[in-house]
Amino acid sequence: MVAQFPRRMGRLFLPVSTVGALLIAGVAAFSVRAQIKTVSDPRERHFANVRQLTFAGQNAEAYFSHDGRRLTFQSQRDGYDCDQQFVMGIDGSNVRRVSPGIGRTTCGLWMKKDTRVLFSSTHGGDPACPPKPDFSHGYVWPVYPTYRIYSVKPDGTDLKPLFPRTLKPGEESGYNAESVLSPDGSHIVFTSDRGGDLDIWTMNSDGTKPRQLTRTLGYDGGPWWSPDGTKICFRAYHPETAEEITEYKSLLKRHLIRPTTLDLYYMDADGSHVRRVTNDKKQNIASFAPSWTPNGKGLVFASNRDDPKRRKFEVYKINLDGKGLERITFGDQFDGFPSFSPDGKHFVWASNRNGKEPHDTNLFIAEWIP
């Protein structure tokens, strides 16, 4: 999730918020001329009846409820300086904020039977927006050490800390975010630094019995359960050279990572049999926000692979064996955070297309044509 709102910067153009949500400073503005004043492109052959759901500001990470009738999403609407969590109907109606309106939040998804929403927030450590990272060290993502996992009812009431459930006075929670509920509702997968590195963990859905799945040095994040719950996909950066390892460890001590290259992986749900889907490190390609195709045989994700300057992101589909790569969107600025409805009939994503202002990121939904 680490991850959120797209803007252009240097060699890399990524969404902004934390790690699935990124913060960008020193941003070069798009010209108004560059704005795309259409909601679809004829080359987007998998889409029918594309509809725009939000119409201003920064909106991203929309995910379907289990009954397919509602969406969670994060936004800086209503004057918030930091992302907050919202729910709405799949037609864009009945928008309601469910997070407390303080701190920074990320990665909101539905829990079993759609009775609660799962998300991470920094508000328990400090109600103010956390500081943006220092970009004098180059492009980096913040990994805030006050991200704690919460659940809340869809009407915004009954907010409860889920992990860590309790903290001593003055104790930081550590980074705990990018959480997703398993299809059967029994477990949550998430990214945490509780083991000293950014690894993927699982726990019971009540926040008990955390278990570490990945152990390779580097950032493992954005985990997502396969439709049958037997596998987990994720994005990763694993430093290899002495220089890369030194830089990674130095940044991590300051709660930062440098995401200029990210590859996609998947593994069995117990952390075994890790397999690599993309191998783009030498090309400085970043692929992120993976989620599964409805049949569980492939992934959809965002990547800057078709832009030589690595600034523009589009949505792609790929088989688990790394073959069958197909570009899905042609927004020509930023398209990302793709996700299917539970029945596989609809597709939602975030895009810069058709924005009122040069930096607007909005949510779009389409009927999916296989």
What kind of feature is each model-predicted range?
Residues Q35-A48:
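Blade/loop signatures of beta-propeller domains
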Residues N49-Q52, S93-R96, T146, T157-P161, ...:
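Predominantly a core beta-strand signature of beta-propeller blades
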Residues P15-A28:
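Bacterial N-terminal signal peptides
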Residues G89-S93, K153-T157, N204-T208, D268-S272, ...:
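Short loop/turn segments that connect beta-strands within beta-propeller blades
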Residues F55-Q58, S75-Q85, P100-R104, S120-I149, ...:
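A flexible loop/linker signature enriched in serine peptidases of the S9 family
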Residues H66-D67, K112-K113, P183-D184, P227-D228, ...:
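Residue-level detector of Asp-centered blade-edge/turn motifs that repeat once per structural unit
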Residues G68-T72, V117, I188, I232, ...:
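Hydrophobic beta-strand positions that form the internal "hydrophobic ladder"
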